[in-house]
Swiss-Prot record:
Gene3D superfamilies named in the record: Bira Bifunctional Protein, Domain 2
Reaction it catalyzes: tRNA(Phe) + L-phenylalanine + ATP = L-phenylalanyl-tRNA(Phe) + AMP + diphosphate + H(+)
Chain's gene name: pheS
UniProtKB keywords: Aminoacyl-tRNA synthetase, ATP-binding, Cytoplasm, Ligase, Magnesium, Metal-binding, Nucleotide-binding, Protein biosynthesis
Protein name: Phenylalanine--tRNA ligase alpha subunit
Pfam families (alphabetical): Phe_tRNA-synt_N, tRNA-synt_2d
Details of cofactor binding: Binds 2 magnesium ions per tetramer.
Residues involved in Mg(2+) binding: E252
A GO term from the CC aspect: cytoplasm
PROSITE patterns (UniProt xref): AA_TRNA_LIGASE_II
InterPro entries for the chain: aa-tRNA-synth_II, aa-tRNA-synth_II/BPL/LPL, Phe-tRNA-synth_IIc_asu, Phe-tRNA_ligase_II_N, Phe_tRNA_ligase_alpha1_bac, Phenylalanyl-tRNA_Synthase, tRNA-bd_arm
Subunit record text: Tetramer of two alpha and two beta subunits.
Cofactor(s) for this UniProt protein: Mg(2+)
Amino acid sequence: MTKIDFENIKILQDKIKDIEIEKNVYDERNIFLKNYLSPLYKELKEMSEEDKKEFGKQLNQYKEMIEDVAEKRINEIKKQKILNIKSEYDINLPADYFQSGGINPIDLVKNEIVKFFKKANFKILTESEVTSVEFNFDSLNIKKDHPARSISDTFYIDDKQLLRVHNTAITSKALRMFNKEEEIKVLSHGNVYRKDDDDATHSHQFNQIDMVWVKKGMSLANLKWLTDKLLKYLFNESIKIRYRISHFPFTEPSFEVDINCFFCDSKDHCSVCKNTKWIEVLGAGLLHPNVLKNANVKKGLSGIAFGIGIDRIAMLKYQIKDIRRLYGNDFSLIESFKGER
């Protein structure tokens, strides 16, 4: 088994130590990753399962060290910029005390999920909130007469453009973008829009995460493993998880995934789960063959996918009963998350 030379990170340190522009630091980091890390991933694919476990751990450690070196230099550049400003201006004049808030629960959950998938080497994508009918509907096997296409459900800009109704629109574009690769691992996040009346549990704008993982031999076992791992990471290891058969045009088979309700243990009536003892948290499934075909993905590959409403997860994790509080600049709510990251 190849031994990783952790000492060669000094090469990157020497390259970036005198750089004064943040973008140039990232450029040097990317070159280093291509020259030193990418070849190791190719070697990993050829190893036995036993060797892969140990070598994979070393690879992740190596990658984190590379990222840390780059981020350290970036922080030094930012700090120097502040010092330069201080030398030109007197920024120490007295000012009124401003009470600070904290990070919005939506961002807290999003950051948790992104961190989870970054560790699994997923590409993290965001796109314009305006997308095409093709990527939002056509390429995702959504029929012309599907109710979601109706102007009563979707915010159209013109005949060909709209505000995306799900982040699967980014996924469909990513599948086409990376269709020459043997493995595609993509996570997208951002706002989505639907013509819902705003109330305690609905909003015309909300945040969504969409995941797709394509490679040879992907199955329901992979989907269940990844979904279970994510939900236990977000909530706790003891939660119960249930899969129900459902239908989505872009997956086959499709499932809705529930977790056991942790609000109603001591209540006669639970307003969260309506006494069903279960709470729906995401939709998932195997990518429909037509979706892969429309993206010209290599033959012989299969994929798993799921979509998660970030707002819903935030409401469950932090026991927020009205979704409007997440968007209403409610300082008392945001202040309670001071110190969270």
